[in-house]
Amino acid sequence: MSAQHMFGDPSNSSSQPNPGPPSPTRSTHRADSISKHKLVQITSHNQYTSPRLTREILAPSPLEQFRTWFAEAQSPPNGLPAVAEPEATCISTSTAAGIPSARMVLLRGVDERGFVFFTNYTSRKSRELIANPHASMTFYWKEQARQIRVVGTVEKVEREESESYFATRPRGSQLGAWASQQSKEIGETTLQDRLDKFEKEFEGKEVDCPEHWGGWRIDPFEIEFWSGHTSRLHDRFRYLLQDNGEWKIDRLSP
Ligand SMILES: Cc1cc2nc3c(=O)[nH]c(=O)nc-3n(C[C@H](O)[C@H](O)[C@H](O)COP(=O)(O)O)c2cc1C
């Protein structure tokens, strides 16, 4: 499989960023060469100890539960350490063919409609979200041995919302959004050249929100809360959205 095949062509149309699964030739090659690889062996056995999560203390709605945990990550109650940057989250997307990719983004808001983050609409993640409007977000709050998985359908946020959030960004980040053709292959000086160009263009003026920049919202149909415990006997509770709009809560085996 060529590198082009692996990473897709950013200049390509939005519908098929990453074509096709790995070819058999590539898999055979990997199997042949695997014995030559030096194994990085990790034998640590960290023990996680979070406050126990029980059905009795779970909120009836996952949004409420998320709010409680997020507030505890920011301002922890006695005995729990604070979480550095709890809004940092791993967002997983996939192509129409089902090839996944993941990367970190910053959660910028959450309400009954879903979980919002902002990005470039021509980036790899956005091209994948256009081709396959489903995503998963994973929060890992190491300090508190907590994990949350959100799975749902996605939609772009209203233009007005993107513009009003963009207006709150520092000027440098606003100009960066104009300069960066996110996920595109570029030359060594392209970014600086483009930044210089947009600095000139917006000199003495407010920086508008570019058309190619804005938010995505994940409207969840599944949210799981994971709380780490000793001997890998963690607590897991999954909320699943039912046809009648109610959330069904199940405990899952760790
Ligand atoms: C902690 C952290 C937060 C980030 N936040 C964002 C973000 O909010 N939006 C964004 O577009 N990229 C963000 N990035 C960069 C992305 O991880 C990624 O490199 C970029 O969006 C391009 O991804 P893509 O090529 O898969 O589209 C962040 C990276 C880190 C490590």
Residue ranges and their predicted role:
Residues M1-P254:
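Binding-site signature for planar aromatic cofactors or substrates
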